[in-house]
Design a protein with these regions (language model features):
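Short glycine-enriched nucleophile-adjacent loop
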Residues: 1-11
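Helical cap/lid subdomain of alpha/beta-hydrolase-fold lipid enzymes
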Residues: 16, 20-265
Length: 265
């Protein structure tokens, strides 16, 4: 979003110059003060490749969402009318049951599941540029520990979200192999349950600095904040796991300190 606001999108501008949205025209960098990512898969997540590359899991997930819209049980507008699987935004007419459209979407590269893959994130990052006047901060978490021979494994001392007890070992095991056309080495093993720690630190090819509170913060550079060990991907939006931040108050203090940091630059 920050990159679009600042630099726009040339393809969109050339497609329809008269009716192009202001978002795609760029020139709004003065309205962006800072960008903060929290447990973000900047460079994709190998676990997403198992869903998107295999097609079948992606198809099933899209199909389930589609069925909720068809039956009227979904309270959310999924805004997938271009695929014909949610209601028409102009008429409000519900979409009919259309598994073929769901399959077509699953086979495409036009969904967030693909963007979260290793190769999808790489393509997306080539389209995104840092805004030179904005401040960038990146927070990450980790629920694994070092094992034998450079591999990682789930740290049982941490209170991980139940589904992550399946996905975390999968990420740790998905190393020393090619995934999404890229060789994934052992450094991709540590994770927060859904995002490899290596991916959460900063976007590859972007300027980055390890945060030091004693030094002046400069814009246009990613500041890599200390990794929070013991917190999983879900803990950043749930104060119930008091172990993750030391206490329930620690959860609120995390966001208060983040707010103070942003306001101080």
């Amino acid at each position: 979003m920050a990159s679009l606001l600042a630099y726009g999108n040339e393809t969109e501008m050339n497609a329809d110059k008269n009716n192009c949205s202001e978002l795609f025209k760029g020139g709004h960098e003065k309205g962006i003060h800072s960008v903060t990512t929290i447990a973000s898969p900047h460079n994709g997540s190998t676990v997403s490749n198992y869903v998107s590359d295999a097609v079948a899991p992606a198809f099933l997930m899209i199909q389930l969402l589609h069925l909720k819209c068809v039956t009227g049980k979904s309270h959310n507008d999924l805004m997938l009318d271009q695929w014909g699987i949610t209601k028409d935004p102009f008429t409000g007419e519900k979409a009919g049951f259309n598994p073929l459209a769901c399959l077509k979407m699953a086979l495409s590269m036009d969904h967030c599941g693909y963007d979260l893959t290793v190769q999808g994130a790489e393509k997306l990052n080539k389209m995104i540029k840092t805004v030179k006047s904005a401040y960038y901060f990146s927070y990450s978490a980790c629920i694994t520990k070092d094992g034998r021979n450079g591999y990682t494994k789930l740290n049982e001392d941490y209170d991980a979200f139940l589904p992550f007890k399946l996905s975390s070992p999968l990420i740790s095991a998905s190393v020393n192999m090619f995934i999404g056309g890229k060789f994934i080495d052992k450094s991709w093993g540590a994770n927060d349950g859904i995002v490899p720690l290596k991916s959460a630190l900063y976007p590859f090819e972007e300027d980055h600095i390890t945060y030091d509170e004693a030094k002046v913060i400069i814009p246009g550079v990613w500041y890599v904040m200390p990794t929070i060990y013991g917190a999983d991907h879900y803990d950043f939006c749930n104060a119930a796991d008091e172990k993750a931040f030391g206490s329930r108050q620690g959860f609120f203090d995390f966001y208060m300190n983040l707010s103070k940091l942003i306001c101080s630059v």
